[in-house]
């Protein structure tokens, strides 16, 4: 049973469900369509005190692959908008990569922040 909603596991679950749903919309004659499902969950900067690190987990599923990425932020030197922008850039990078575009948008992470890829 899932115990943390802000986790790689939850992002993967979301991506898999989104992929399954996208398949249900596909007409059988459209077999060259590049389907994907994407999931993103995060605990990012807020105006109230919150324990734990600022982080986000993104997963993307296709018929042949499942990739997941975890972003860890410097919560003392980031605000919500800057974290949201980085997450958005990584989501765009994921979608672009699925479609064969490998020219990633730079995330401009701080020295003590990281992007970790799994799967």
Region annotations inferred by a language model:
Residues 1-105:
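Short alpha-helical segments enriched in small residues
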Residues 103-119:
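Non-catalytic propeptide/linker segments at domain boundaries
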